[in-house]
């Protein structure tokens, strides 16, 4: 499990643990993700574009940056008075802290499968 992990994982490790390493990203992927989007930069991007809804995404790690199969997402409303710091806190409290434990539980209980790059929960 990764959270705020800003180090590139070696490709061999990713291949060895395909669909077994998970990450959480503070946006609704595919928006505001990839190279350069981390920490407050994500929320600054959201606010500068006037986005109305953001959130968080738990996904499997692959060779790309925030490109792996999406496990769970949760939306959070963006408020007119938000600062990047306030939005970051709300995304953590209302989304990240909820969906990461849920994703771990689903995986630990064998309820997550990946077929053709898409996650199925059952």
Spans of features found by a protein language model:
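Donor/substrate-binding cores of folate-linked one-carbon enzymes
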Residues: 1-117
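Generic recognition of long tandem-repeat/solenoid scaffolds
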Residues: 119-122
């Amino acid at each position: 499990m990764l959270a705020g992990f800003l180090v590139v994982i070696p490709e061999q490790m990713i291949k060895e643990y395909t669909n077994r390493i998970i990450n959480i990203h503070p946006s609704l992927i595919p928006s505001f993700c990839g190279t350069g989007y981390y920490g407050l930069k994500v929320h600054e991007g959201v606010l500068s574009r006037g986005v109305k809804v953001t959130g968080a995404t738990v996904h499997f790690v692959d060779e790309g940056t925030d490109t792996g199969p999406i496990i769970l997402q949760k939306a959070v409303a963006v408020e007119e008075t938000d600062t990047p710091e306030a939005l970051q806190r709300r995304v953590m409290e209302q989304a990240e802290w909820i969906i990461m434990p849920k994703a771990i539980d689903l995986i630990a209980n064998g309820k997550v499968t990946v077929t053709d790059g898409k996650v199925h929960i059952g």
